Amino acid sequence: MMRKFLLRLMCWVLFQGLIWAAANAGERQPTGWDVFVHGQHAYVAGGENGLYAVDIRQPANLQRAASIKTAGQAKGVFAAGSFAYVADGSAGLQIVGIRNPADPVMVGSVDTPGDARGVYVFSDYALVADAQAGLQVISIRDPGRPRIVAAVDTPGEAHQVAVAANHAYVADGMGGLQIINIRRPTEPKMVASISALHDARSVHVIADHAFVADAAGGISAIDIRNPSRPQVVGALKTPGEAQGVYPLYNLLVVADGSRGLQLIDIRKPGSMRIVGAYHTPGETRSVFGLASRVYVAGSGFGLGVFDVIDRSRLNAKGHFLVDMDR
């Protein structure tokens, strides 16, 4: 008797699941993988939905200015000059013309051997964090014909990359933080690494320190005054899983997954402390700071904007653009 009841219950649950799946099959879930602010627009890497340009002149009334579908899954974005550079998953690097943000156009692309997740542009080069394929160095001198000119294999999966003083700092997942000399971009050389991390997802450099978002490990502060001999000088567990970091004034804003945004005082990197936390409608993935505002991208919403108050805290409630296609 009990066996029949359980069988009927399982069938009912399965049937309800099929109904829900059918009802939601055509929906495009709002997802922001990464965000970069350039001029009066925030450019949001929207996964399988491509790249979005959002007008941010009125944070209380965020408006999608345009979008463009990319060949893969847009996971990272960096904007410079008249172009947005998109780390497009299995489709490598996509270059989008944004001279007119309301009418973006595809300009060029180059496939990469891995899964492009993050991108950083400096001079005539784009550095792509290419997951299992490590760091790819791409010449963008001719945006219509980008080409790979060098690569460095890393021990983990490269998620994101930052550049400071002729060095690239790669958040390399289980491989920790990898430091690569790029004085000669076509001849990059590994110089050091910090492997004693949990799962490095993102990195940002400010002054003499690299701050690493280390997923369940929280935040690590690394002294990089001598890039060939980096040292962990501080660590702080966050309540969620740290995915993205961005320094602003004496603070570090952390995209902390299901726990929204965490605000960390980094005036003393060896004794960091959480000074604020802010709710978001979904899981945060990436954060960008500019002047008096913080921009956050995540799943369950596309883009959120918080105002900075007194250089020490954010307004309690941010403004969110949940429906990126409206």
Where in the sequence are the language-model features?
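Bacterial N-terminal signal peptides that target proteins for export
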Residues: 2-10
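Feature marking well-ordered beta-strand scaffolds used for ligand recognition
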Residues: 14-326
